[in-house]
Amino acid sequence: WDRALITAYMASFGVIVSATIGITVGSLCAQNRLATKIILLVCDTFQTFPSFVYLIPVMILFGVTDTSVLIAVIVYATIPATRYTVEGLRSVPESLQDAGSMSGVNRLQRWIKIEMPLAFPHIMLGINQTVIFALFMVIIGAFIGTEDLGQFIIKALSDKQGIGNGLLLGLCVAAIGLAVDHLIQTWANERKRVLGLP
């Protein structure tokens, strides 16, 4: 149980920080076509790397600690949040943006009242992906010695008699992911209803 809480804590912290960074960077880059192309290229490039690659530089800089894993989680999980935020904001029809500008709203008001609500479904899809990426990287982080469910999973998989334990631990990780996904979906659906989105 304590290992499950550590896993949930590390994944949750990673998701919160990754989502904050991803939505901020995505919102800024979506305002400019060149910045959009550059950030999407960066996201595509980072997604081609194997997940273990993210652990190497942080291990060199910070050593074999939970901090290293958290930094790797944040870097890895920021990618979908950034990508889906950019794509969501770029998908807002220009006619609605022009209508907002003609109504006298400034850029910040247009972003808050028009662009973000319409991009909301895309952004929440990105947050869901961020949760999955964060959980995945936390489990991978067990290879460098984190004290979470991932370590038990690795031990179970290396033991011929540990198949049942490995399956049970895998289900625990899946349950954490499903619980977070359900919470996000419930909140997202409520926000859609409030904003009048389909």
Feature locations, PLM:
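Membrane-spanning helices that line or support transport/gating and their immediate boundary helices
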Residues: 23, 27, 37, 41, ...
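Short cytoplasmic-facing helical segments at TM-TM junctions of multi-pass membrane proteins
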Residues: 80-123
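Transmembrane alpha-helices
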Residues: 75, 107-141, 164, 168, ...
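Generic hydrophobic transmembrane alpha-helix motif, especially the helices
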Residues: 43-77
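Alpha-helical transmembrane segments in multi-pass membrane proteins
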Residues: 10-14, 18, 22, 26, ...
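Interhelical loop and adjacent transmembrane-helix boundary motif
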Residues: 143-195
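Hydrophobic alpha-helical elements at and bordering transmembrane segments
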Residues: 4, 8, 38-45, 85, ...
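Transmembrane-helix boundary motif in ABC transporter permease subunits
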Residues: 1, 13-43
